[in-house]
Every structure is written in structure tokens, then in C-alpha cells.
Amino acid sequence: MDSIIVSLRLVAATLLACVVGYTSVILGVAQLVPDTARGSLVTAADGTIAGSRLIAQKFEQPRYFWPRPSAAGKDGYDAMSAAGSNKSPTSADVAERAREIAARYGATGDRPLPAELAAASGGGLDPHISVRAALYQAGRVAAARGIEQEQVEALIEQQSFAPGGVLTRDRLVNVLELNLALDAR
């Protein structure tokens, strides 16, 4: 009988330590970085939550910058199904999708599409594109919004960052944040 009581006390102490103690410690540590702990949410100018800066969203209107293609989920951009397609780069499906995307962007031999705009990222939900890929789209976005292309290019530069600091050459832009900055103008 004594061993049962000791066992029950041990179970209760373990549950208390693991369920309450561990959870409280993790929650407390997360509060040191509250933005990240809450999913790195981005709010629009009107105060509504527009999305997360960590997950790509689908933008299809010409007035917005378009992210990399996504293979996550049936129609892409499904955060619950984040993954690449696992198809070979030599796959006929991948080649056909790349041709369709290049046509959508109006790519030509004189103006080839940056590869990242035709290929999904490994996780399928990469929220960033390179400044080069953003500049490729600047003309379309400016024309659709009725503003000067130089204004759009200046905003791209303003929104750009180097993810590795001085260790990286390529600058990136977050597509959601860039589109929200355009809407705020």
C-alpha cells in the first residue's frame, strides 16, 4: 500500500513539474520576445492582422508583388501543409509550371525571369524574395497602381535587408510587408 501512495505522489509531482512548471518556464521565456512568441504577426494600416512575416501568402493582383510559387497544399500557400513538392527539377510537371509562371510574368529571352520566381522554396512558404526579383516586378506594380516605377523601386530599396548582415551579398524583401507599405502610400 505504501508503494502505491509513493507512486501516486511521484506521478502527481511529475505531472506538476512537466505540465505546469515546464509550460510556465517556456511561456515566461517566450515573453522576452513577444512579437516572435505571437507568430510575428503583421498589422495593416487599419490595425487588422494582415498575416505573419514568416509565412508567404498568395497575391495575384497585378498591383501587388507576387511571392515565390508554393507547393504547400493543394492550391499552394497552405501553412498547414508546408512542404516542397519533392519533384525533381527535371520533372515535366516542374518544367510546365515554370513555363506557365514565366508566361504570367511576361518573361522573354531579353528579359528572363529570375529563377526564384519560377521555383518553389524547400518549405513552400518562403515569405521573402530577392531585391532582384522585386525589381523585376516593379514595372507591373507601378503600372497597375498608376505611380512612377522609380517610386516603387525606392520603396523596394527602403524595405530591403541583408539577412546575414555584412556576411550576405543578396538583399531580400518581405513580400507581405512590401505590399502593405505600397498600400499605405
What are these regions (language model features)?
Residues 2, 6, 13-14, 180:
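A broad, structural surface signal
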